[in-house]
């Protein structure tokens, strides 16, 4: 049996990519470049793939980024066995309880606690069966939060492809087929988190202040209840305290005692009551359809 020849190479950071690109152009080579986020892949006519990732220097390299390809391989295995999950509409996982926040700022102040869900999207991907127990545990053991987030976030990337002929770019396109294959996994993970957000609001009501991606904010006297709620859902957590400062109908500002700094976020029309209403209407429509 002939030995398989390696064709995929990790070739360095983006600075090395720019050097390689400049050389390939000057030497009038023909090749393709696939770009997503901080990653670049140069595909040569002989099939060799030169992979580049991250900015120069160890401090700029996202720790745990190696999980991206591991997740992709397991998603490929899932597709081969089960197919692609149904596409769901993009949903919001950053919402606010405008009424409760205004009440706090009107003088009825009480401490607010953020209950951070550890590796939220990673846990959801595992709960949905998208990644194996082995990869799930390996990811957690890295203790690299950014790496876990990027590994899931990359499922929704739309790769850009540039085709070079004799060193000149002759075409730019997007790999919509790849995006259509992987993005449903990402949005199902987000939708499951959205459901968690809605469920938490139904439980905590006026003691629920906001939900930011993977953190539930409640009154301090409901902290243990929030922890138990998340524990029952299969999540782990850690806590930090915040204090709301202002709400001008567009932006909400608070002091974060974990990071010891002021934070501001655009609130717009992201009132949890609206999203609860939309969610309930969809649930009723689904029940009628069945």
Where in this protein do the model-derived segments appear?
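Conserved acidic
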Residues: 1-290
């Amino acid at each position: 049996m002939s030995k398989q020849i390696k064709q995929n190479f990790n070739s360095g950071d983006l600075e090395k990519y720019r050097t390689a690109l400049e050389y390939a152009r000057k030497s009038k080579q023909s090749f393709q470049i696939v770009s997503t986020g901080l990653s670049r892949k140069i595909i040569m006519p002989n099939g060799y793939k030169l992979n580049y990732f991250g900015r120069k220097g160890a401090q700029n390299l996202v720790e745990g980024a190696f999980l991206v390809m591991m997740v992709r391989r397991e998603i490929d295995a899932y597709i081969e066995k089960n197919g692609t999950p149904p596409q769901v509409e993009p949903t919001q996982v950053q919402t606010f309880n405008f009424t409760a926040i205004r009440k706090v700022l009107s003088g009825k102040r009480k401490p607010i606690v953020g209950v951070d869900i550890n590796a939220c999207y990673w846990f959801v991907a595992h709960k949905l069966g998208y990644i194996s127990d082995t990869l799930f545990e390996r990811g957690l053991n890295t203790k690299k939060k950014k790496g876990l987030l990027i590994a899931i976030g990359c499922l929704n990337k739309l790769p850009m492809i540039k085709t070079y002929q004799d060193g000149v770019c002759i075409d730019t396109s997007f790999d919509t087929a790849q995006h259509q294959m992987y993005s449903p996994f990402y949005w199902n993970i987000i939708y499951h988190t959205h459901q968690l957000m809605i469920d938490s609001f139904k439980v905590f009501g006026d003691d629920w202040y906001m939900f930011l991606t993977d953190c539930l904010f409640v009154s301090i006297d409901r902290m243990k209840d929030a922890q138990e709620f998340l524990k029952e859902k299969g999540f782990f957590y850690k806590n930090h305290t915040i204090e709301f400062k202002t709400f001008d109908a567009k932006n909400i500002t608070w002091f974060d005692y974990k990071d010891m700094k002021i934070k501001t976020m655009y609130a717009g029309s992201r009132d949890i009551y609206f999203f609860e209403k939309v969610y309930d209407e969809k649930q009723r429509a689904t029940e009628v359809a069945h």
